């Protein structure tokens, strides 16, 4: 690591987003990972998808080993000017109305549970009455 820290702006770092020129921001530090693109176990797409933003969460979510963290030092090129990094937006779910289940099917089922046995009983009585021999 160089003794003098170079401070880079977010705009400058975000322009390095290609396979042949790839810089990442991880924990406030800027890394030129271009030489590592072919060697990265996850492939270059993983690294490219983390450009143009603070890749700290992407890096930490994978759970890199201590060896991987030590390897990063040789790709270190400077610090990011935190005032130039856009604020990360947190996901806000769209507001949805409360679930209002239609009670009609439940009501109809209760009515049918009451009426069907009565109709069967009534039909049985009618059939008995007409089939009764006098």
Curated annotation (Swiss-Prot):
PANTHER family assigned: CYTOCHROME B5, CYTOCHROME B5 ISOFORM E
- Please give the Gene Ontology molecular function terms for this protein: heme binding; metal ion binding
All residue ranges annotated as the Cytochrome b5 heme-binding domain in the record: 5-81
Q: Which InterPro entries match?
A: Cyt_B5-like_heme/steroid-bd, Cyt_B5-like_heme/steroid_sf, Cyt_B5_heme-BS, Cytochrome_b5
Residues involved in heme binding: 40, 64
Q: Which UniProt keywords apply?
A: Electron transport, Endoplasmic reticulum, Heme, Iron, Membrane, Metal-binding, Microsome, Transmembrane, Transmembrane helix, Transport
What name goes with this protein? Cytochrome b5
Q: What is the topology of this protein in the membrane according to its UniProt annotation?
A: Single-pass membrane protein
Taken from the UniProt entry, a GO cellular component term is: endoplasmic reticulum membrane
Of which family is this protein a member?
A: Belongs to the cytochrome b5 family.
Q: Does the keyword Transmembrane helix apply?
A: yes
